[in-house]
Swiss-Prot record:
Binding-site residues, substrate: T28, G29, S30, T31, D81, G82, T83, D84, K94, G95, G96, G97, K121
Function per UniProt: Catalyzes the reversible conversion of ribose-5-phosphate to ribulose 5-phosphate.
GO annotation (BP), single: D-ribose metabolic process
Oligomer and partners: Homodimer.
Protein name listed in UniProt: Ribose-5-phosphate isomerase A
Family (UniProt): Belongs to the ribose 5-phosphate isomerase family.
Involved pathway(s): Carbohydrate degradation; pentose phosphate pathway; D-ribose 5-phosphate from D-ribulose 5-phosphate (non-oxidative stage): step 1/1
GO molecular function: ribose-5-phosphate isomerase activity
Species lineage: Bacteria, Pseudomonadati, Pseudomonadota, Gammaproteobacteria, Candidatus Palibaumannia
Keyword Isomerase among record annotations: yes
UniProt cross-references to CDD domains, sorted A to Z: RPI_A
Length: 223
C-alpha cells in the first residue's frame, strides 16, 4: 500500500511541469497511470497527448484526453514516463511493460524527458532488473545467441508477450552494466533487434523520485 502511495505522489508531482498549450508524451506503466489521472484534471488546458502504448491509450481515452498521432505533430514539449531502474547518470532500464520501442521514440521526440519513480528504482549499477529487448519473431533464437556472445548475460524469451508492434521480448539476466551507452549501441546493432530497453543515449533530463520524505527533483548535469 505504501509503495502505491509513493507511485501516486510522484505521478501527481509531474503535473507541475505541465503548462497550457503543451503536447505531452505519455509513457506506460503503473506510475504513469497516476500521471494520467492527474493529467485528466487539466485536460482542458493542454493541446493534447501522444501515447506510447495501447494500454495508455485506453486509459487516456477513458479520461477524455485528446490524443494525437506522433506523425501529426512536430514534436513533444515533455515526455513523462516511469522506469524499471535509474542510475545517477539518469540512464535507465525500461521495458518491463513491453512498450520500450514506442517509449524510446517519444523520449527522442521530446524537448524534455521527465522520469517519475519511487526510490526503489534508484540503483548504483544498472542490470539487476532484466534488460528487455524487442526482437522481430523470426530472429529471436539467433539474436539470443548473439546476446550471449556479446554481453555474457542470459537471455530469456518472455512467454506470452507480443508487443504493440507485433514483436517479442527477450529479457537479459545477469548483467552488470558499467557502460550503458556502449552496450545500447552494441545491442541495437544486432540485426533483428528493434531496440533495447537501455535509455542511455537519450536519458532523462529530470527525475522525480518519491520516498517517505517526499519528492526529490534531480536534474541531469550537462558535461
Amino acid at each position: 500500500m505504501m509503495h502505491e502511495k509513493l507511485k501516486k505522489a510522484v505521478g501527481w508531482a509531474a503535473l507541475e511541469y505541465v503548462s497550457s498549450g503543451m503536447i505531452i508524451g505519455v509513457g506506460t506503466g503503473s506510475t504513469t497511470d497516476h500521471f494520467i489521472d492527474a493529467l485528466g484534471t487539466v485536460k482542458h488546458k493542454i493541446e493534447g497527448v501522444v501515447s506510447s502504448s495501447e494500454q495508455s491509450t485506453t486509459k487516456l481515452k477513458s479520461m477524455g484526453i485528446l490524443l494525437f498521432n506522433l506523425n501529426d505533430v512536430d514534436g513533444l514539449d515533455i515526455y513523462v514516463d516511469g522506469t524499471d531502474e535509474i542510475n545517477s547518470n539518469m540512464q535507465m532500464i525500461k521495458g518491463g511493460g513491453a512498450a520500450l520501442t514506442r517509449e524510446k521514440v517519444l523520449a527522442a521526440a521530446a524537448n524534455k524527458f521527465i522520469c517519475i519513480a519511487d526510490t526503489s528504482k534508484q540503483v548504483d549499477i544498472l542490470g539487476n532488473f532484466p534488460l528487455p529487448i524487442e526482437v522481430i519473431p523470426m530472429a529471436h533464437a539467433w539474436v539470443a545467441r548473439e546476446l550471449v556472445h556479446l554481453t555474457g548475460g542470459l537471455p530469456k524469451y518472455r512467454q506470452g508477450v507480443i508487443t504493440d508492434n507485433g514483436n517479442i521480448i527477450l529479457d537479459i539476466y545477469n548483467l552488470k552494466i558499467l557502460d550503458a551507452i556502449a552496450l545500447e549501441k552494441i545491442i541495437n546493432n544486432i540485426p533483428g533487434v528493434v531496440t533495447v530497453g537501455l535509455f542511455a543515449n537519450r536519458c532523462a533530463d529530470i527525475a522525480l523520485i518519491s520516498s517517505d520524505l517526499g519528492i526529490e527533483e534531480i536534474s541531469r548535469s550537462i558535461k
